[in-house]
Curated annotation (Swiss-Prot):
Residues 134-221, 248-328, 365-453, 553-639, 686-758, 1070-1162, 1241-1324, 1464-1547, 1560-1642, 1703-1789 form the PDZ domain. Keywords: Cell junction, Cell membrane, Cytoplasm, Membrane, Phosphoprotein, Repeat, Tight junction. This is InaD-like protein. Gene3D superfamilies: 1.20.1440.360, 2.30.42.10. It comes from the Eukaryota. It comes from Canis lupus familiaris (Dog). The lineage of its organism: Eukaryota, Metazoa, Chordata, Craniata, Vertebrata. Pfam families: L27_2, PDZ.
Amino acid sequence: MPENPAPDKLQVLQVLDRLKMKLQEKGDTSQNEKLSLFYETLQSPLFNQILTLQQSIKQLKGQLSHIPSDCSTNFDFSRKGLLVFTDSAITNGNAQRPSNNLTVSGLFPWTPKSGNEDFNSVIQQMAQGRQIEYIDIERPSTGGLGFSVVALRSQNLGEVDIFVKEVQPGSIADRDQRLRENDQILAINHTPLDQNISHQQAIALLQQTTGSLHLVVAREPVHTKSRTSINLTDTTMPETVHWGHIEDVELINDGSGLGFGIVGGKSSGVVVRTIVPGGLADRDGRLQTGDHILKIGDTDVQGMTSEQVAQVLRNCGNSVRMLVARDPVGETSVTPPTPAALPVALPAVANRSPSTDSSLYETYGVELIKKDGQSLGIRIVGYIGTAHTGEASGIYVKSIIPGSAAYHNGQIQVNDKIVAVDGVNIQGFTNQDVVEVLRNAGQVVHLTLVRRKMCSSTSPLERSSDRGTVVEPSGTPARYVTGAVETETNLDGGDEETEERMDNLKNDNIQALEKLERVPDSPENELKSRWENLLGPDYEVMVATLDTQIADDAELQKYSKLLPIHTLRLGMEVDSFDGHHYISSIAPGGPVDALNLLQPEDELLEVNGVQLYGKSRREAVSFLKEVPPPFTLVCCRRLFDDEASVDEPRTTETLLPEMEADHNVDINTEEEEEEELALWSPEVKIVELVKDHKGLGFSILDYQDPLDPTRSVIVIRSLVANGVAEKGGELLPGDRLVSVNEYCLENTTLAEAVEVLKAVPPGIVHLGVCKPLVDNDKEEESHYILHSNNNEDETELSETIHDINSSLILEAPKGFRDEPYYKEELVDEPFLDLGKAFQSQQKEIDNSKEAWEMQEFLPPRLQEMGEEREMLVDEECDLYQDHFQSMDLYPSSHLQEAAPVSSVKELHFGTQWLHDSEPPELQEARSMMNMYSQETQQYGYSTENMIKENFGIDSLPSISSSEGNSQQGRFDDLENLNSLTKSSLDLGMMIPNDVQGPGMLVELPAVAQRREQEDLPLYQLPRTRVVSKASAYTGASSSRYTAGACELPEREEGEGEETPNFSHWGPPRIVEIFREPNVSLGISIVGGQTVIKRLKNGEELKGIFIKQVLEDSPAGKTNALKTGDKILEVSGVDLQNASHREAVEAIKNAGNPVVFVVQSLSSTPRVIPSVHNKANKIANNQDQNTEEKKEKRQGTPPPPMKLPPPYKAPSDDSDENEEEYAFTNKKIRQRYADLPGELHIIELEKDKNGLGLSLAGNKDRSRMSIFVVGINPEGPAATDGRMRIGDELLEINNQILYGRSHQNASAVIKTAPSKVKLVFIRNEDAVNQMAVAPFPVPSSSPSSLEDQSGTEPVSSEEDGSLEVGIKQLPENESSKLEDISQVAGQGMVAGQQKALDCPTDNAVSQMKPQKYSTKVSFSSQEIPLAPAPSYHSTDVDFTSYGGFQAPLSVDPATCPIVPGQEMIIEISKGRSGLGLSIVGGRDTPLDAIVIHEVYEEGAAARDGRLWAGDQILEVNGIDLRSASHEEAITALRQTPQKVRLVVYRDEAHYRDEENLEIFPVDLQKKAGRGLGLSIVGKRNGSGVFISDIVKGGAADLDRRLIQGDQILSVNGEDMRNASQETVATVLKCAQGLVQLEIGRLRAGSWTSSRKTSQNSQGSQHSTHSSFHPSLAPVITSLQNLVGTKRATDPSLKSSGMDMGPRTVEIIRELSDALGISIAGGKGSPLGDIPIFIAMIQASGVAARTQKLKVGDRIVSINGQPLDGLSHADVVNLLKNAYGRIILQVVADTNISAIATQLENMSTGYHLGSPTAEHHPEDTEEPLQMTAG
């Protein structure tokens, strides 16, 4: 039977919880039922009663032998199982009373009858001469006894004494008037509280008593009448203490704060902990450290916690009046308690004993008295030394907390060694053991310490460092101290231990600062020396003075107006952690940046004499906002990491053996808590790889260190198929890389880690890796550091890298280095980095040697650690410096000015084709490129194959020259949204950075004409003008190409890199350009059969693109072509897969006019229509291949080609294949042996639509997984039958996908050959991890339709039939569906090669006359309703005709925002941020991202198009329709220089008041507390809004207010035009009931706006009035349906979609419009389908309920069923319904789809129009006309 049933039961429950979690993670659900049953049994009341009864029986047996002869043995058991004794009579002083049943916790009572000498003697002994009182209190049937107790440990024998802490006024105990505060309870119900009774048992005795409570108490003689000043926390002095000094202090807050800090608790009182030097309290002079705060204003704060007192202070306003007390007096002088968790000391008895070692050491004893919940006030540190330096081992005093018991004692000094605690020798104990001994010690602690005789006393400065600086014990060799494993421990106890520790850490420096003596010197030197003394030698202190004149905030703001105002003032952002404030980023060009002194990760200590160190972030930021210039900043920078801090203990290499042998590595409690965050095992495993000419065969990324957000770690991202790492089998993706040979990678950036890996010579490489922790098993903690990161080591490392890679490293431009926001970099395709070696002297180049190194450039400093960045470190070529000796093409200044491109660039090399007449520089450049070509041949590849297979490039441009077929080498700097390049290498030549700016067009008259005869490609098509002689050897300068926008941005230095997820190509359009005599067309082109840019999903941009358009040229005059447009066709010649040369020739040979078919990038995915017109027809002389190419291309965007990682195609040799297959399968099974589940390896044959798989990611966005969520019944996967829904893909064709996104898998499937090898694992728990629930009907279901959810054959007259399975998906807010090509959110068949050839509304207007016949089938299997109504499978045939001329696209940079339509706009940020403030998000009732304010100094205000109230739907392709508030802020913060937004402006949202839903909120403001909310005012205009709601406050408990609500009035006083300060003052001064009038943006209107605007942009009407608008196929409706299902309905959030009926109540006045449009009914053209809501108007009363949705089926109106009613009947019902209208509705997926279709059809008609002549309910006629 358990000794302690309750704790044991709790422990078993915790073990069960952990066991269930582990089984769930492994996917094992077989034991769930048993575990649940076990869990329920343990928690059942019956089981608890059995436990209690067993315990009572055991206790009874133990007591029976001790029953006195005169004691009653009558006992019973209560219903709960407790032991109950019955006594006949008890003695209470002189009174005799009958006894009730007394429940005691199994402890036998001793009744104090006359003659019971045993009981009386025990009581007398416990009273120790004090007055004894016998008290009886009748316990009421309800409520408590009215007093509280506190348990304190006494000095003798470590007993726990119970004292009365407080008697509540008016309670039973108070009315009895016998029980008093400070009484010690000696016995409860005749049970003496001696050493046999624990504290918990005593409390149980009090709580479980029924009837009368019999107490025996001991009381000291009363010395004072003061009850409020009794000190309850010192058992050695229970006498009352009253204060020697009480003072009334009044402080007037000047805005800078009160200037003092408080700590404490209910038991010890709240005391002044610190006084800020120079602060208000310090200047006033009356308040002192240690003062007890008794009263604030009229509020008695005794018994409050420090947080409650702080709230009272905050509510006081500007004037704060306090009653404080100090210097308690009584029989004994007692130091008043300082902070709650700090000890209060009595004068210690000095027991200095004779020195044990008269020559070196003296031993002395110290007695410290600590109070309950408080510490001794010392920090200890443990040193691990060797045998011959015993003095370096042991526990030493590291620092002493000012005001603590140790501090007041005065005998303990820093560096004293603790040898014994209460007589227990602690030598040889670990830190943790010593901590436990000290914490478990009694009230009086006897310490025995040893001190070196010649040790001088340390200064307060040495005691005060909490930054990990260890003061070296005298006589201890330095090398052991710096390498010590140090665990700094604060010896706290009680509930406030953590708070106390943090308070102590924050305030050490404050205490030390008070004791510093000023040295006459310059202010800067004085500050510097003061902080240097304080921090020690490990930190460099910097003093910066900024005498700024802030003329314009816009000049300082570089990123976003969402950054706080202090960033504008100082030009830097600050991150705060536990009182430390670190510079996280520095704005380029800002005041701090101009100093060139500070850098990110420096800590900000002080500003203008006010110390920020130790302050909260709110205090620090508030101060930085207000502090006036000039600014004097004091910052520090850590110099070394030799010494471990408290939070990260580690040791240097020299001590590693001792640590491993001893296993006594000390960890404090904070570190144990942090271990829960660790992702990797602390054990370092050494992996040996042999580096060959291809590299190590893995790629890396950096990842935020979970234990330290300011650092990053290097993680293996993926392995190259058949690479060195994969063959070794010991490395896996996710392993943490900590060292390479002797180089430690701790605290290195990603770029530095890549350089280290590249610098390693071929041969054996030793990698230190940490494996990920599995199943939360925590191994034995051991700390390590492989290489000491001091300055000397860093210098050595950088010099080594420089020696090896001196020709690779190009200095990053300063602006780029300071950019704080980075995105993931796909760098599997390196670019050529031209380094310093180009400046060296000329020397002959040996063509046989390897000459080129391909690498990715990334800035050396990465400020933002939250994002992942990756680099490829394989496919290396050995580098020899002498290969570059002759490449002094241009002066060094050009090279240093040229900024490397931080995105992926392509590089091709060919054979030498230049003539001798060319300049030598060109020949040299060409020869170097040839070397690379020869080098790749040595590997067994042709240049083309190598680049094709390893870098994802399909082919190289083939050029016919006089020397035979060769490959042209060129290097086009195509820049995406964030590229920084100012240089280019074109036709194998360097271009100086100063050539008349980027994008300049250059003609080459002499060289160009000569090359024309050789059929060489030229970028400039016409012939005559010379633009610049300075660039006579250049083909073209830097081009700009945007992978996510229609127009390429002007890019500034300092902007970061962003790689879009996927491209969204707009529809093809036709542009005609008429030639002019002797004038060029004015365009330059770039591209060809080469991959230009790889996107995040693996898609590769490839083709012919417009590089630049001259303004005054024929092309420029059309205003139809832009940089970045893709040319699909020129005058009938298809350029989709043309080489660069073919494109040039096609343009040259085109007639007049030149007819281009081009595409521009769009920010949203669209289904692209076919394009057929006269310009598209195939020329008679085109061969059949060209015709086939053209048909393949019709209307489709370029398909993704290859994944980023290099992929080597399998060998053709069948024998080798068999052997390698077996070997590979074995390796695969070894690689994934640790993963839970069943591993499968299969091969499938793709068909024309791919594999027939739909993929999705993990529900947990922090984990990358690829799950199968749907299998097309007609696809290869379903035919094979081995794959199931829920399988997780690990590899495709030896390409490791484990740990990558599902977009990557899709891209691999699409580009894979016909035979696909899949490795996947099957886990039962996978369904719970998938981001998207499996499609409802599996392929094996007999009820499934032909294609599971309906197919959509789309036929056109000229294209063949194309069939694709579209799945209607259940709503899931966290879904991240596979997005194949241009179809968003529909889970299309993965591997589909063609985009669906369906027009959207927008695309219809841009098509030539053509005919579509679209059959739409709605799947009934999606609706789990029984019985299924007949309308579930309605077929609707739509036929549309259109004859529209394709218009030119609207320029998003200038187009106005049309209300009621989704608009795409572009805004260039310039030198400021966007300047937007937003509200809303899916996690708020607003459920949409809405602009709250447009700041006048921001880019949006300068642009002038965005208004407050506009809804933001997308930001640079990131969909915000279902984003949370934080996700939207993140997306807006990380925008590049040119921002592309999709916005929607509701037509009804022109008048502010109309947008608001106004409602009253009454909050009860309690005395001493606020309302629990923060407010903020608009910078421009009026209005005060709620910015934050405090947890636990009145507003939070009320649960009606949200962030973004506007306060319209307070207690009837209008606040619409009031300032923030006015509203704050009114709210602070309000008392009691506070009546607020709140305005909130209507959520219904935004929801409706989003729904009705899905396809509004660009929707066209037929030019023939007899035809209705063209209807988009239902795929667009399904897309809209998925997009419009929102989490507004709580049922959706919990279970996907609530199919049950809902009752909606609408209050409608006579003048109100109901605001809904209905469709359906008996006899409807849509069929006899039920009445459903077709539209909801934002301005109607129905929208205000926020409970109705488009597509809801109306079951009844005011109780009248609608079954069998016609449309007109229901319209009349609604028209005549006023007052209280009760609608019963039900959500229906099929109805929703039809409703959404009708929305699309009705665009442009009167639906919801406020100007409609008839009621909005009556909308059937136009709907019928449209649908007919």
